């Protein structure tokens, strides 16, 4: 599936809503591949979570020695979704996991990628965040940083969302950053139509 096709899929998928306006996901199997998608902000509660960017210390798994810090709002949404994906991710017939999200969903996709690479180091895991905001804060442990190296953030032009929360507040981009498209405006560059156009070039 091309990135253009994946972006279209992210925007058109029929999401399972676990909490109105808060947590949603889409999961499908295609052969041995598990595809997990996360949608953009879909209500006032999502927007409130987007601005709950106080960082919290995170040690999400039993026996995990490394502590890292994450955006409080995004991490809270991910923890609602996580229990619904545990069995899907652990399924031994899954040989590849493909993760993607747009905007708010890009941040959740990043946290899902971290979860999947930690729990399924035996398989290929890919992750893309289209117009994804920053999630990690402060120093990131080497083991976590190495796992996250395969996550790709796609930034269209000067998309302002990919610069938030600001570095001034200690947040940092993690993974690989790729810029597509020509800058038009910091807000306009975040529009779905702008990403759709940039990904066709």
Where are these regions (language model features)?
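Non-catalytic, mobile gating and regulatory segments of ester bond hydrolases
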Residues: 1-100, 104-201
């Amino acid at each position: 599936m091309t990135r253009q096709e994946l972006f279209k899929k992210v925007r058109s998928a029929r999401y399972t809503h676990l909490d109105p306006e808060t947590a949603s996901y889409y999961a499908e199997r295609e052969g041995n591949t598990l595809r997990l998608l996360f949608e953009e902000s879909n209500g006032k509660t999502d927007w409130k979570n987007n601005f709950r960017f106080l960082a919290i210390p995170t040690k999400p798994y039993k026996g995990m020695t490394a502590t890292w810090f994450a955006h409080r709002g995004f991490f809270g949404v991910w923890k609602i979704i996580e229990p619904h994906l545990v069995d899907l991710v652990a399924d031994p017939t899954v040989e590849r996991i493909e993760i993607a999200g747009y905007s708010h969903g890009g941040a959740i996709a990043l946290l899902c990628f971290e979860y999947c690479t930690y729990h399924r180091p035996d398989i290929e895991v890919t992750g893309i965040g289209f117009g994804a905001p920053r999630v990690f804060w402060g120093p990131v442990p080497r083991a976590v940083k190495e796992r996250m190296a395969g996550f790709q953030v796609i930034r269209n032009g000067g998309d302002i969302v990919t610069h938030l929360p600001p570095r001034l507040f200690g947040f940092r981009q993690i993974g690989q950053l790729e810029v597509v498209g020509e800058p038009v405006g910091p807000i306009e560059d975040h529009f779905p139509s702008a990403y759709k156009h940039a990904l066709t070039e």
